[in-house]
């Protein structure tokens, strides 16, 4: 039986509002919202803060609803803003609304970028957005935010954070095209293609395996790295590689593999039809999580998954990884690249570097 599609094909919406009201951002602990139905164990916070039109009606296009599946946050914004709560500091001119700003890389390249699709907005005087639950509601703009936003002509460094009630002379509100654990709009392919096109066409970056030095959900990433190295994969720790170099690697690779999580989301920047290989962990034991399945379908990649298994330990069996790779790649492992990897670790060389030659 074919699973329902996670990609929708509706025409994206974009509203232009006059005299709209932005309520201030607020984090609400689950214990402080007892009227809400119980959530799953990893749920962290409710949020308040969205736009209302001049009549006090909530602008649903401005809301990150959340709370679906394993999502860790959900909105508490009421449908109507009472008359006595309307008003606020007036912001003259034209503003662009970006919704919640995601500090976390994986959230930013999925739902965060999904309000950056509108290309014909015209000049704006202000860029505004909300914080999110990460880092206790504080915004941390990093190099990857700046680079990706600049490729899409969005001046993120000008973004003002909505922490006090504000009334807008005029505000443009693009729809959020990625609804976490619900669906993603096919128009997002255009966003990722615009990014990929700026980095594609260079020399092949070969087979890539994206890893990390430590993981709460996988106890033996070094052993997994060696399994992939034995099949000719370059082991890369993305946090050590500048974002522009990362995007060039993803746009020009032959196979993209990763531990489960944000690294695997980078398939969105790769070419359609690319083979991807994900290694499961204690969260994604049998299948990719829903966000990753959305990314796979949107990116139109040939996705493979190595199950973690049902054991109580946090380690995955390296022999299981190698067995799966033999089956997926139809080839045998080699010892030489593993020895090279160990030397690179010793001398701190797990950044971008040069592609390995296949022998």
Predicted regions and their residues:
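The feature primarily captures lumenal catalytic ectodomains
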Residues: 1-359
């Amino acid at each position: 039986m074919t699973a329902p599609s996670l990609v929708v094909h509706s025409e994206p919406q974009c509203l232009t509002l006059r005299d709209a009201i932005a309520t201030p951002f607020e984090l609400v602990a689950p214990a402080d919202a007892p009227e809400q139905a119980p959530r799953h164990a990893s749920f962290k916070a409710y949020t308040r803060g969205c736009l209302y039109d001049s009549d006090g009606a909530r602008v649903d296009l401005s809301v990150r609803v959340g709370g679906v599946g394993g999502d860790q946050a959900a909105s508490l914004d009421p449908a109507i803003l009472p008359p006595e709560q309307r008003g606020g500091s007036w912001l003259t001119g034209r503003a662009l609304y970006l919704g919640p700003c995601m500090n976390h890389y994986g959230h930013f390249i999925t739902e965060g970028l999904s309000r950056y699709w509108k290309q014909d907005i015209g000049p704006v005087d202000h860029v505004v957005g909300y914080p999110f639950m990460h880092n206790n509601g504080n915004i941390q703009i990093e190099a990857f935010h700046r680079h990706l936003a600049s490729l899409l002509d969005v001046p993120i460094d000008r973004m003002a954070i909505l922490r006090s009630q504000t009334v807008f002379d005029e505000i443009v509100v693009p729809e959020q095209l990625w609804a976490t654990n619900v669906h993603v709009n096919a128009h997002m392919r255009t966003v990722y293609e615009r990014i990929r096109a700026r980095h594609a066409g260079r020399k092949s970056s070969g087979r890539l395996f994206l890893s990390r030095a430590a993981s709460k959900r996988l106890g033996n990433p070094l052993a997994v790295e060696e399994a992939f190295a034995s099949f000719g994969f370059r082991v890369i720790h993305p946090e050590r590689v500048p974002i522009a170099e990362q995007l060039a690697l993803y746009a020009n690779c032959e196979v993209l593999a990763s531990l489960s999580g944000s690294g695997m989301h980078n398939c969105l920047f790769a070419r359609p039809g690319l083979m991807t290989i994900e290694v499961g962990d204690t969260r994604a034991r049998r299948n990719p999580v829903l966000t990753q399945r959305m990314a796979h379908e949107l990116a139109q990649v040939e996705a493979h998954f190595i199950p973690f298994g049902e054991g109580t330990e946090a380690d995955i069996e390296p022999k299981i990884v190698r067995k799966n790779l033999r089956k997926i790649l139809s080839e045998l492992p080699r010892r030489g690249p593993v020895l090279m990897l160990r030397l690179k670790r010793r001398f701190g060389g797990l950044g971008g570097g040069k592609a390995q030659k296949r022998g």
